[in-house]
Amino acid sequence: MATSTNGIIDPPIDDLLSKVESKYALVIFASKRARQINDYYADLHEGSLFDNVGPLVDSSVDDKPLSVAMHEINEDRLVLKPIAAAE
């Protein structure tokens, strides 16, 4: 059975900030992933399973997509790789 997440207080923000360069990068990274998770659940209702990737950590449908994204980042299921600068 999936364990329930504790929202934004778990994982701690300090742990999350060690995974990215800045708070801004964390917000953008987590929000983009949360949108993908939200789209995945919307696709489930439409019967399409192959357009988006679902949660990579144990979660339930009741968990907020942003909380799930934060847990994925904290558990190193997602890694932010910077794009190489144009020369």
Curated annotation (Swiss-Prot):
Keywords: DNA-directed RNA polymerase, Nucleotidyltransferase, Transcription, Transferase. The keyword Nucleotidyltransferase applies. The keyword Chaperone does not apply. Its EC number is 2.7.7.6. The RNAP catalytic core consists of 2 alpha, 1 beta, 1 beta' and 1 omega subunit. When a sigma factor is associated with the core the holoenzyme is formed, which can initiate transcription. Promotes RNA polymerase assembly. Latches the N- and C-terminal regions of the beta' subunit thereby facilitating its interaction with the beta and alpha subunits. This is DNA-directed RNA polymerase subunit omega. It comes from Leifsonia xyli subsp. xyli (strain CTCB07).
